[in-house]
Amino acid sequence: MAKISFTPARHRRRKKVLKMAKGYFGSKSTLYKTAHEQVMRSLQYAYRDRKQRKRDFRKLWISRINAGAMLCGMQYSYLMHGLALAKVDVNRKVLADLAHLQPGPVESVKAVEVLQQETQPQPEEKTSLQPEKVLSTELSEEKSDDTLETKPQTTQVKAKKPSLDLSKMLLHELKKLAKEHKVPNFHKLKKAEIVTALKKALAKKII
């Protein structure tokens, strides 16, 4: 039976690992054992940071867009909400490059001046006018025209409070309302919980 030698395969395997460990400090680039340990650890770091890099760049883009929006007197949330309403399909990477490289970046985006008006909350006040109630005056035939007393016409107008759609409001606006209506622990609640708490508070005031 012929003798089998694994020397060539073992040599290729070790040579491959040492090639991947080229440039490492000390024995991590020369000895196979320590080089293999460091290469395995480096591959784990590379796998983890391929995911982490996407998160880090998103944070960087948001901070740059926010800085550019503050120069125009806007907030990041208002800007992104306004761009969605105006159907401007520009991603955060491009917006961050505009804010970082060009002066007055956000102003160059289309419809930004219109967005400031559209994104500001402007509740529409709806007033329902009731028909005028005219108090009829009874005139007596015996009295003359000079002595007639007519009661003034009275109009009763009840203005309803504007019906706010709480679900369409932003989170910081809901927190302001919750602070005004003294909702307990509103800063710890989520958006849906704040909406339900505000509805209960408004219902109590109406009653």
Swiss-Prot record:
InterPro entries: Rho-like_N, Rho_N_sf, Ribosomal_bL20, Ribosomal_protein_bL20_C
GO MF term list: rRNA binding; structural constituent of ribosome
Any Pfam family hit: Rho_N
Any single GO CC term annotated in Swiss-Prot or TrEMBL for this entry: ribonucleoprotein complex
Source species, domain of life: Bacteria
Similarity section: Belongs to the bacterial ribosomal protein bL20 family.
Stated name of the protein: Large ribosomal subunit protein bL20
